[in-house]
Amino acid sequence: MMASAPQDRPAGTPPQGRGLLIVVTGASGVGKGTLRERWLAGQDVFYSTSWTTREPRPGEVNGRDYVFVSPAEFLAKAQQNGFLEHAQFVGNHYGTPIEPIEAALERGQDVVLEIEVEGAMQVKDRMGEQAILVFIMPPSLTELRRRLTGRATETPERIEKRLTRARDEIQAAHDFRYVIVNDNLDRAVSELLAVQQAERAAQKAAEHWTPEEQQARALADTVRSTALSREALQQVVES
């Protein structure tokens, strides 16, 4: 059972000394992987490698991008309650092993998950407000279609399935704490760094924040999902 937060710290933030659990999610093709690599470069964070039953894409490395397993191996792990979350997406299974995540959080190391939206919501249900959900959004569905087509790894039918699912996910963007539009990589990286620094600062009283932490909080507030209008989301799915 999680300890309650001290009164000088916002409810739901992890205890001081415990790592942050940052969950990055979004539609396939939105650029999560590239963004995550730039954001975490040089950082001492624990990046959780998901298990999956899908086939590796060209250039993917087992154990770095995913742990590629058979359906039987995946099912056995799930039956042992070995996943923090797991979900099926476009015919393949994805899951996040729980043991290494808890160990990293306990030693004060920030943990980053890059997972599907369904899995992200499972993490939120299980971890509550300690799970910092960041939704990466495309500037438009037209741009997302272009990126998916350009990868040349999906059939037209699967691309249409991904776009249909992406439309639903974008319209539910207010379910996440933060929403970052990935139309400019440098800006998106800066916003992710600000979110991380602001959430770390939230573990202590605001009067103890440094000027850099105050600046990070101000930038992070601009990408809170509450700052995004329904009209803006509708514009993304219709463009």
Curated annotation (Swiss-Prot):
Supply the alphabetized keyword list: ATP-binding, Cytoplasm, Kinase, Nucleotide-binding, Transferase
Asked whether the keyword Nucleotide-binding is assigned, the reply is yes
Entry's InterPro entries? GK/Ca_channel_bsu, Guanylate_kin-like_dom, Guanylate_kinase, Guanylate_kinase_CS, P-loop_NTPase
Residues reported in the UniProt entry to bind ATP: G26, A27, S28, G29, V30, G31, K32, G33
Annotated Guanylate kinase-like domain ranges read 19-197
Q: Which reaction does it catalyse?
A: GMP + ATP = GDP + ADP
Q: Among the entry's GO cellular component annotations, what is one?
A: cytosol
Q: Where in the cell is it found?
A: Cytoplasm
Superkingdom of the organism of origin: Bacteria
Q: Does the keyword Nucleotide-binding apply?
A: yes
NCBIfam families per the UniProt record, alphabetical = guanyl_kin
Q: What does this protein do?
A: Essential for recycling GMP and indirectly, cGMP.
Q: Which PANTHER family match?
A: GUANYLATE KINASE, GUANYLATE KINASE-RELATED
Q: What is this protein called?
A: Guanylate kinase
From which source organism is this entry? Deinococcus radiodurans (strain ATCC 13939 / DSM 20539 / JCM 16871 / CCUG 27074 / LMG 4051 / NBRC 15346 / NCIMB 9279 / VKM B-1422 / R1)
